[in-house]
């Protein structure tokens, strides 16, 4: 009873004790959550994986079939599973159920009176818990706390910010009081000691990720209920062996640590018996043996373990279902993993050394293999993979053979893109394959892709295919990509009922085929091919998108029945007509830019169309655009001279953006005021720049919603229409003719206004814009003042330029040294002959740029110039005109010059005269000019003989000479000569003497020249011997030679010869020497030839020793040998050379005796007697070995035989002989003892050295002892290796063994990025396995000192140059804040420096590092200077067709002319240089000057004007019903050339029209309309000379154009022999035969005319012609269709009693023009109506077949008169 009572009492007290905690209660079962922080590491890993996933799928098309998408989703789920973080999203949970709060048997009891700060030493931990438990965000940690409050918490999130944040936790002391914790998140902190949580046995989930100081997991061993553990991203964590015994742990995440060796041992039982998932990504594992001991391991993630070379050690992990070994870059082989029978997925992506996957076989449950981006060359067999569904082998560049991919009955996805496959192979037995990716390989054929009944996705893009074959056995194909191959024909793409995506782009396709039976097709891509016809695109009810851009398309077909087509792109083709673009109810976008379109049709019934681009075409007008109710964007730019009309634009009322730049709108003036745009009230953007001809913009006044308007480069003067456009924000009006901008003053929303290149001189209307901060650019204005000033030397004008505040803007510069003062500009001392002067203005302030040039025209005074003086002779006749010409008189502007020459100068009187020259223009008298005219006496005339002869050595004076040549002048003036200096009487020859004279005025006579001849001496005669003989090598000079041959002359003249050059005394032979002599007068003797004989050289004798010895291997050449045997020749000089066969006979490496023969031969063929020498080569002596007697080595020493020989100082006295020993075979350095080693040697001659023995002693080893400094410090960021650390602490081992190496954990135990103290442990083990005692060393990382900043003292930038703060730091070469320093440099550059204003600015640079150290600031001066000269770029040449419409603006566009400065205009001489109507190459120069007056370097562009072939003109001939009556013809010509054609004659029809036109880019047809002709009647009359009928008239009828022939009939009592012929015309004709009274008959003769071909075959009926004997006849060949006459086409002769035959021979024509009418006989002009033809009966009549039609016209009315005359004259003749 007492016991029960006690329990009740205790219960009451316990409830009373817990009462204060009622404030924590939220509800019966509710959870109070104060933080919801997810684990940052989990986010990072997920983001990383997501990034990799996105990167990997960027190249995949969005249009993949659903099956492919499902596969992709599966892969993504798997990726998410791989990166799962077990302790993510832990929320703080406080348990409010008092019955569950355990306060008995507590392991740690909270001391009474505790506060959070006292219980938890870490201030951050204390404060966080205080906030969590009290619910007060302002808690400080000084609040009271007891066990109950802590025991109420079951889930706690204490994750930090970065692990390096001031609020992060570094000490978790106190957490031991939270004994009811089941979930704890301590990620992103600075925790290194886990001891406080070692007894929290209720923990199920623990997150310790991203604690950079955590080096081990000591403390987790007792967490027996732990199921999830996250220790990822702990870079110092190497060992996780403490988890090995956790009995229920199911999941470990240890990715991104520093684990190299995975040691998992549990002596007490099974190792991690329940572990299913192990995350070990991004470590440095090399061995996976421990993982094979985990009995339930299913999922293993070892991605990014770069040192892992094989998976073979996993063989025992038989429960594994998933292995992710991606990015294990050292993985070379999988090893034997055949035991992993439950494996379902293996991922090997990015294993860049993995060359084979041959072990992936016999895995019955394997579903997914992903091995992309490896180095796989060999697939092995891939046998027995019955469940494999996904095989990813992409980007294995060396994989060429895929024959192993067969017999996989469940395979659905096969990715082989980016490999090196050249042949597909068989792909047998893949019945369920749905997706096949083969892009980016080297395939030339895909004919093997067949019998894949479920294939829905096929990508073979980026290969070398030339054909795609039939593909008939792919009935379910939905997605096909064959782009980027070499296909020319894809016509087999028909009858694919499921195909919804086709991509054939980037090939060379010309033929697409009919593309029938593709009912499911949604998207078709054929861009970048050679397709010319896409008319097959019709009747495709599901087609949504077509891209056929960048082809050669001319025919786009009808586009019928495309109800769902949304996007159509045919840009960059050769399309001329798009009139079929209508009735497409779903079309939204239409791209047709860069074509040749001239006809766009009506473009109606396109209710969904929102975007149209027709730029770069030849569209003449936009009038055809119909009702497009949703069109928002219309671009018709760059149609240039073709687009001249807008039409009404009444069907596009919803248009928001209209771009019409670079056209010729209003070229003809028909567009008026742009009223066609006035109803487009929804427009917000309008671009009409570069139309060039727009002047009236009043039609834009209603566009009240406009925000952007560009009217650049037109002819606009008046902009008042813009005053109501109050929504305008940006307006561009550059390059127009605007003077007044007051209309813009109230546009309050305008924030950017461009007015450059106009005629504005008053900018004050822009004041409101400038004051509110808008940008106004009005540079490069050009204005010419209207008043032309006249002046004498100076003039003044008022300054007309007004600044925005209304005040005059002072000039920035004034030409011709003008000055500015008080608002006036004055020019003085104007002397230049110019028509104008100018001044510039330029100011930039408050966002306004205003600059330009004002030109002031003026008339300047005339200035006259002339020569200072002019000379004439008395009696000259000179007019004033001639005088002005003689003195080169000119005026500065070409005005006439006058003078007083005629009145001032007397040309008959000697003296000097001053003449005044003047000029006048526009009433302004010019400056006068004075010329001195001198009138002088006439020059004397000299006469003398032209030649004279003197004897040599004669004595002649100048006076005597003048007398001898009869020299005199007409004025008796003195004559002077150069006789005494020019003539040498002591030397024969011809000399020229000059005679001069001058009158008293100094006027000189014309010089006369006399030739003086001094007679010469006769030629000398040489005498000498005819030949002479010398010994070879004798020495003779030319003088000795002449002496030897007794050479002499008869007059003592010197003899010369070519002895020195002609004779070679060192070479035997006969030489010819020529002797010459010249006397003192230069007269040469006859040359004399002398023969010089040089005798042959004597034979020499050889002497030498008879024998010579050499050591073996002696280095002796032939020269040395001859020297050694003292070989010599007794003759000197001699050409004989000693030679021997020493080098071919003697072998110095082979001992023996050799006989050497010495010979000598001179150049003249003399051979000396040979000399023999015996040469003995001696053998090598036996070698001798020397060495130390013994040597000692420590145990375990590593000594090679070579080192041993070196150590014992083993030497041998003979090189190339090797000492050998039994050291390596007999001496064991791992075993102490004495060993005998024998040294031997044998030379190459087989002689052995005496053996030498050496004793080798091997010592025993010692235990190492480590010594080192106890402490050391380093600067933060120092780059210290472990080797350097060991050196710095003087670490050594006492045993002195080189194999004993000291190791440490220096690299893992220290972090040079964080200043603090670290403990490093040193270890060493000798080769006997004895370990040294570990030694601890304290390493202190010092705090980072403040960075020392250095930079240039100043830097300069151009005005307006774009410079960031980063650029500024780089430009001043800032140093001190670069890595590894954490100091971050800052400056006030952006706030201090105004780059739009020139001047100097002081910028201050500061820096603070992460340890809080502040650098000393430094200052830099920034100079902002004027802009540099602009730079022009342009194409090297531009081509135009002759007559093409272009101008300077178009030229600049076509040449892609650009300049690197805004608001700087490029100027050209295009208009002056280029004649577009004349073929040729012209050079155009581009120039530019910026507002600072700096000129760009000129750029030259070649403009090539060529003839352009135009489209043909068809000529048709039709009757009144439109039926063709003659073959059509074709006219061709060059573009813009005119053509004119007359209607041709067509039998039976009439047309008198002439049609003309101009050849153009469009094929044209002209039609001649003919009227049928009713034929007229030909009446034949028979009359006598008086006009009386002698027989009844006859009539001939027929079709117009038919030939007719009429012959005079026989009439009794009358005579007439005539035949008339012609053609029937539409007018009646009359032919009259005139008869004479019959006379007594005369004998007649007969001519038979025959017409045959070249073989004699008859071509036409023969014709007989008769006439009186002795009368002459003339017959002509008949015109026969298809034949031409061979030879003469006429014959003449005389009728005789004997019958005659004339035969015309024809040959067949090779071709008859279809365009020429066929002619029977010669073309005849029919006689006009009622013309009477009278034929003389005494004249041989024409045959009719060959008469010209002009005959009737010629004889016409005159024939009667001619006939009458003949009638009257003929009888007299007969009498």
UniProtKB/Swiss-Prot annotation:
The species this protein was found in: Listeria monocytogenes serotype 4b (strain F2365)
Signal peptide: 1-28
Compositional bias ranges of the Low complexity kind: 36-50
Function: A role in virulence could not be demonstrated.
A GO CC term attached to the entry: extracellular region
Domain MucBP positions: 1507-1566, 1572-1631, 1641-1702
Family as reported in the entry's similarity comment: Belongs to the internalin family.
Compartment(s) where it occurs, according to its Swiss-Prot or TrEMBL record: Secreted, Cell wall
Propeptide position ranges: 1744-1775
Disordered: annotated segments: 36-97, 1713-1737
SUPFAM superfamilies: E set domains, L domain-like, PKD domain
Name this protein carries in UniProt: Internalin I
Record's keyword terms, sorted: Cell wall, Leucine-rich repeat, Peptidoglycan-anchor, Repeat, Secreted, Signal
PANTHER family: LEUCINE-RICH REPEAT AND IQ DOMAIN-CONTAINING PROTEIN 1-RELATED, LEUCINE-RICH REPEAT-CONTAINING PROTEIN 9
Short sequence motif LPXTG sorting signal: positions: 1740-1744
InterPro entries reported for this sequence: Cu-Rt/internalin_Ig-like, Ig-like_fold, Ig_E-set, Inl_IR, InlI_Ig-like, Leu-rich_rpt, Leu-rich_rpt_4, Leu-rich_rpt_typical-subtyp
Domain LRRCT: residue ranges: 782-869
LRR repeats: 152-176, 180-201, 202-224, 225-247, 248-269, 274-295, 296-318, 319-341, 342-364, 365-386, 387-409, 410-431, 432-453, 454-475, 476-497, 498-519, 520-541, 542-563, 564-585, 586-607, 608-629, 630-650, 654-675, 682-704, 705-726, 727-748, 749-770
